[in-house]
């Protein structure tokens, strides 16, 4: 009897969650993710190249962010600065759209029937759940993006440049490495959901505390400068706490080196490069992700409020 009741209860819970989904969150998240990534993709390219720079001769040597950007521009041109942009835009748009979509549905489900706001831990868990669900769908796009970004222009061995584009990379990775190849970096990626969870928790709490401080309703809409400030602070906090996993994931997904797994990457990076190896690329990453986060959240908040306003007008 108990065994029959559990699936029924589980499906009832899921149907309750899906009752809270709103397409507005999906559309607004996609809009923010796409716009921010189109604007700042070259800095993401720099971050990836620094993250995997471990002394191999096959890789170009970069002295800093500007040197990296100018070298890529001279050798590969504008196209070089936008290597991997297609899967990045697809991945970022889909990731942000699904993240906001799942997160708001889970959050609405948890707040249904209660007057008080969620506790910090509840925000953290809700965002982690949304992140894990999103990663299950989008990980192949992130593997593809990394592979395309690591096709260096001017490389002597032409075999190092084996992908013609996003779909070619997806097909070849699946053909030669199977599903496992498309999900390389998935485990550190799951740990990476802690980044999004910490960011969303900080973002929600900062919004609530700020509105409380200036005597506004907890869910009151902020101005654009206020959204920018809150988003920037939450992003810097999350990056400082979780950056090393991004280096581990990038190295696992790199086609030039073969690692035995997450622990193999961690041990080898620590032995060869020390603690600094886990923070390679953090400067260009912070320069990129902070404004990217601000663009994403400002676009998301404004588009979602606009679309939700249209929904309310239709209902009334």
From Swiss-Prot:
UniProt-reported outcome of changing residue 249 to A/W: Significant decrease in mitochondrial folate levels associated with deficient glycine cleavage system. No effect on its mitochondrial localization
Solcar repeat residue intervals: 20-109, 118-209, 222-306
Main location: mitochondrion
Listed InterPro entries: Mitochondrial_sb/sol_carrier (IPR018108), Mt_carrier_dom_sf (IPR023395), SLC25A32-like (IPR044712)
Descriptive protein name: Solute carrier family 25 member 32
Annotated Pfam families: Mito_carr
Gene Ontology CC annotations of this record: mitochondrial inner membrane; mitochondrion
Record membrane topology: Multi-pass membrane protein
Organism lineage string: Eukaryota, Metazoa, Chordata, Craniata, Vertebrata
Effect of residue 95 to A: No significant effect on mitochondrial folate levels
Membrane spanning residue stretches: 26-46, 89-106, 123-143, 185-203, 227-243, 281-300
Gene: SLC25A32
Outcome reported for the amino acid change (mutating residue 19 to A): No significant effect on mitochondrial folate levels
GO molecular function, one term: FAD transmembrane transporter activity
Catalytic activity: FAD(in) = FAD(out)
Organism superkingdom: Eukaryota
Family: Belongs to the mitochondrial carrier (TC 2.A.29) family.
GO BP terms: folate import into mitochondrion; mitochondrial FAD transmembrane transport
Function per UniProt: Facilitates flavin adenine dinucleotide (FAD) translocation across the mitochondrial inner membrane into the mitochondrial matrix where it acts as a redox cofactor to assist flavoenzyme activities in fundamental metabolic processes including fatty acid beta-oxidation, amino acid and choline metabolism as well as mitochondrial electron transportation. In particular, provides FAD to DLD dehydrogenase of the glycine cleavage system, part of mitochondrial one-carbon metabolic pathway involved in neural tube closure in early embryogenesis.
Reported impact of residue 184 to A: No significant effect on mitochondrial folate levels
